[in-house]
A protein has these predicted regions:
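Residues that define the transmembrane beta-barrel architecture of outer-membrane proteins
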Residues: 26-30, 71-75, 101-105, 135-139, ...
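Outer-membrane beta-barrel architecture
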Residues: 33-35, 76-80, 108-110, 142, ...
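Oxyanion-binding "anion nests"
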Residues: 49, 56-98
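Outer-membrane beta-barrel "beta-signal"
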Residues: 36, 145-146, 167-179
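Aromatic- and glycine-enriched pocket-lining scaffold segments that form the walls
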Residues: 1-43, 47
């Protein structure tokens, strides 16, 4: 944290295919993040990653084939705000894998309606391939009960609308225990 606790940043040089998996290429990726803390509970953030990916399978969304090293770049800007018992967050992101451009945006609102009980709503848009317009939108509404710090019971309904595939609806429940 720098400048009177108003700025956070991170920068890294990375190499790897994932946890416990040897990297299949020699290139390094660079990544960075910058957070600006404004007016107490308002945050504006930006991040990026620039590097090379190694395809472990053929892509469903573009012409990247198994074993191919390809350009993998991402950037995002976002903001979050908390006021009393309400928290909101939104983020916009773009990516480029080889020559395929993608984009996404989401918004999330969480509001405490009773002690330890919160309502959650979100909208999530993803365009996996801007050229073919491979788009999906997810609408999510739910409730969660925090029965212990970092432990919750959650239920939510999701409606997923796909442009190139069928739509879907999901009703799910989750128990989260963290220590």
């Amino acid at each position: 944290m720098l400048i009177n606790k108003k700025i956070d940043y991170a920068f890294s040089v990375q190499n790897g295919q994932g946890i416990n998996t040897k990297d299949k290429n020699k290139q390094k990726d660079i990544a960075g993040k910058l957070d600006l803390h404004l007016l107490g509970s308002w945050l504006i953030s930006g991040s990026f990653i620039k590097g090379k990916g190694y395809a472990i399978a053929d892509s469903r969304y573009n012409d990247i084939k198994t074993g191919e090293n390809y350009r993998r770049n991402r950037w995002s800007v976002g903001s979050s705000f908390a006021y009393k018992k309400m928290h909101a967050r939104a983020e916009y992101m773009e990516g480029k894998d080889k020559s395929t451009r993608s984009q996404g945006v989401y918004g999330l609102v969480c509001c405490e309606i009773l002690p330890k009980v919160e309502l959650i709503g979100s909208v999530d848009f993803l365009n996996r391939n801007k050229e073919t317009k491979d788009k999906q939108v997810m609408y999510i509404g739910g409730v969660q009960y925090w029965f212990y710090p970092k432990c919750r019971l959650a239920a939510q309904y999701t409606y997923q609308k796909e442009k190139l595939r069928g739509n879907a609806q999901v009703l799910q429940a989750q128990l989260q225990v963290s220590f």
